[in-house]
Amino acid sequence: MEGRAAGWVRVAAVGWAVAACAVAAGMVARRGAARVRWNRAVAVVRDLEERCATPAELLQRVVNSLAIEMFAGLASDGGSKVRMLLTCVDALPDGSEEGISYAIDLGGTSFRVLKVELGAGSTIINRKVEHQPIPENLTKGTSDDLFNFIASALKNFIEREGGEVEGRALGFTFSFPVRQTSISSGTLIRWTKEFSIEEAVGKDVAQCLNEALARNGLNMKVNVLVNNTVGTLALGHYYDDDTVAAVIIGAGTNACYIERNDAIIKSLGRVTNSERTVVNVEWGSFRPPQIELTPYDICFNNETWNYYDQGFEKMISGVYLGEIARLVFQKMAEESDIFGTAVDGLSTPFVLSTPNLAAIREDDSPDLREVGKILEEHLKLPDVPLKTRKLVARVSDIITRRAARLAAAAIVAILQKIGCDGTLCGSTQVRTMRGVRRRTVVAIEGGLFEGYSVFREYLNEALVEILGEEIAATVSLRVMEEGSGTGAALLAAAYSSARQKNSE
């Protein structure tokens, strides 16, 4: 009996050992499978990092390509990927403007109404700003409906603020591509961003607003039509006459700069009151051949209503960066289970905003608490492990870095075009005074640049890499809060004063 019992024990021990080995083998297999799935997610991120790399030599080629496109755009209409639109602005505010003027600033799914009171010596005595969201149906309805809504908002604003409107100057910032026919008129070339009112294309947008103002009983007319970059340039120049360009990096991106009239070949012979004219670059449509589109850029372009239009803008501006990140996270979820099994939240387009992306990148807490909160609240991904949160933050960093460095290259292209980058593209002597290199000021506006510190750091870092420390030290990026609308009011005041002087 004892021998038989001992045999049973030995059999049981062997069975237990076999079972334990099987369990251990299963655990090893599961760990191995989990490691494989994790490595797949990491591979997605590494591939993104390689495709989004922007070393200094690559950025310099982007600079050169954009500068060439700018030359071509100044030579002929339709000869370039960037439109290089003439703005008819040949004089900028100089600080002598006085009085009250109004402005409307339309550039996205909301607009601003402003009342600006100016005093002598570059003094803004008072500025009132009111933000007004635009209902989605008006972005796809009729031009009459849209401009009636804007005019009605201006009327209500004026009534609340009080004061006379008779003869008051009105600036209109309209941040969509327009072919300017005079300082106060221009025809819409096409819509960008969320707008698609097709019957408005080809219409004079200032006239559309004037008619809406009349329908609303307002005895005032647009006397200056500009886009947001020109408004920002005007405010920058109002404070500092070393301001040579303006850049918008917000929901969209674009730039303008002061150009010599003799460099604008397509308009030689045009009668102007100055030797220089502000040119609207429209660089959002630039497509740098040196920059490879990632699978996520391609997927995103295929899903948007404007397809492959505005390719440069889609890699830089605030409307799009969060969506690119979402597509990357979706791919990571397809390749692995790092977000768990319930990942339906990743399928909703634009559910992740660029402010969310910025908050993810700027979360410096040890456990990346804010990253986890955003993943749970916006993408419906609860209890994401810390190592996965780190991978999410890395994706946000890659997308941010590419955007900021491309924006820096575009800024340098303008500096190169006007000879402020230390090259022979223009006469660098223009920017010297008594042998000392003068400052070059670029006015800048937009929530992405103003509100995202890491973006600013990467942009400034790239400027130094491209320009070199000596030249970069002479370039100042100056933020202009409410620049586009305030600048339009300043220009309206400046041109109103000029007309009064000419009529006297």
UniProtKB/Swiss-Prot annotation:
Region (Hexokinase small subdomain): 94-226
Membrane topology note: Single-pass membrane protein
Chief place where the protein resides: plastid
Transmembrane segments: 7-29
Chain segments carrying region Hexokinase large subdomain: 227-482
EC number annotated for this UniProt entry: 2.7.1.1
A GO term from the CC aspect: cytosol
Binding site for D-glucose: T192, K193, N227, N254, E282, E313
Matches recorded under SUPFAM superfamilies: Actin-like ATPase domain
Keyword Kinase: yes
PROSITE patterns noted in UniProt: HEXOKINASE_1, HEXOKINASE_2
Domain Hexokinase: start-end pairs: 39-493
Top-level EC class: transferase
Residues annotated as binding ADP: G108, T109, G447
Keywords from the UniProt entry: ATP-binding, Chloroplast, Glycolysis, Kinase, Membrane, Nucleotide-binding, Plastid, Plastid outer membrane, Transferase, Transmembrane, Transmembrane helix
Keyword DNA repair: no
GO molecular function: ATP binding; D-glucose binding; fructokinase activity; glucokinase activity
Pfam family, one: Hexokinase_2
Tissue and organ distribution: Expressed specifically in stamen.
Pathway terms, separated by semicolons: Carbohydrate metabolism; hexose metabolism; Carbohydrate degradation; glycolysis; D-glyceraldehyde 3-phosphate and glycerone phosphate from D-glucose: step 1/4
Annotated catalysed reactions: a D-hexose + ATP = a D-hexose 6-phosphate + ADP + H(+); D-fructose + ATP = D-fructose 6-phosphate + ADP + H(+); D-glucose + ATP = D-glucose 6-phosphate + ADP + H(+)
Compartmental location: Plastid, Chloroplast outer membrane
Record's function text: Fructose and glucose phosphorylating enzyme.
Family statement drawn from the similarity comment of this UniProt entry: Belongs to the hexokinase family.
Additional record remark: Expression may pollen-specific.
Protein name (database record): Hexokinase-10
Originating organism: Oryza sativa subsp. japonica
Gene expressing this chain: HXK10
